[in-house]
């Protein structure tokens, strides 16, 4: 064979070899590109999981802070119930004593002090006279005929109700107005 043929064969072999190398490179590039896409998808999934975990953590933290705050605010509930029973007893004692009696005045001062101290801790009396009945705050005991008031208006409080930080501690026991039978038939 002549040198030129050998050269041509060599060039041809080099060209075939180069194409095989290019094909292998293309295959490797395709494989790497596919692997990169898989890794990108996985990174997006992990980022989403991380975001959710952080949000869940924040929610748990917020809930725990609320529970701690509520526990602090309402820790005195049992004690407050005992104190409002004492207030009721002092009121009953004052009702049975005459105004101006020194004992009456002493009980009145003690009652006012207890009510004042309860207010300092977020415990407030419910004063519903003249308001419409609200089953969330009041307990109706009886209805009384009263044609001057709208039916369902609170006309008397039998037992004072209390709230603690806007949560019901004890409902007010009340008497409601109703129209007389004579007015209803007219």
Swiss-Prot record:
GO terms for cellular component: cytoplasm. Residues 1-22 have a biased composition (Basic and acidic residues). Residues 23-34 have a biased composition (Acidic residues). PROSITE patterns: GRPE. Pfam families: GrpE (PF01025). CDD domains: GrpE. GO terms for molecular function: adenyl-nucleotide exchange factor activity; protein homodimerization activity; protein-folding chaperone binding; unfolded protein binding. It comes from the Bacteria. Keywords: Chaperone, Cytoplasm, Stress response. It is found in: Cytoplasm. Residues 1-35 are annotated as: Disordered. Participates actively in the response to hyperosmotic and heat shock by preventing the aggregation of stress-denatured proteins, in association with DnaK and GrpE. It is the nucleotide exchange factor for DnaK and may function as a thermosensor. Unfolded proteins bind initially to DnaJ; upon interaction with the DnaJ-bound protein, DnaK hydrolyzes its bound ATP, resulting in the formation of a stable complex. GrpE releases ADP from DnaK; ATP binding to DnaK triggers the release of the substrate protein, thus completing the reaction cycle. Belongs to the GrpE family. Homodimer. This is Protein GrpE. It comes from Wolbachia pipientis subsp. Culex pipiens (strain wPip).
């Amino acid at each position: 064979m002549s040198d030129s043929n050998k050269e041509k064969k060599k060039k041809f072999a080099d060209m075939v070899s180069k194409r095989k190398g290019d094909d292998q490179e293309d295959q490797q590039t395709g494989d790497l590109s596919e692997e990169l896409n898989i890794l990108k998808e996985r990174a997006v999934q992990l980022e989403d999981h991380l975001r959710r975990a952080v949000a869940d953590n924040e929610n748990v933290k917020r809930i725990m802070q609320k529970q701690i705050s509520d526990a602090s605010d309402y820790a005195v509930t049992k004690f407050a119930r005992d104190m409002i029973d004492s207030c009721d007893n002092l009121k009953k004692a004052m009702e049975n004593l005459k105004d101006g009696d020194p004992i009456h005045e002493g009980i009145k001062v003690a009652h006012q002090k207890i009510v004042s101290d309860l207010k300092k801790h977020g415990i407030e009396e419910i004063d519903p006279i003249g308001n419409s009945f609200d089953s969330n705050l009041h307990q109706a005991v009886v209805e009384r005929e009263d044609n001057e008031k709208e039916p369902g208006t609170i006309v008397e409080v039998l037992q004072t109700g209390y709230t603690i930080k806007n949560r019901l501690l004890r409902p007010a026991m009340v008497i409601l107005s109703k129209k007389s039978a004579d007015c209803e038939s007219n």
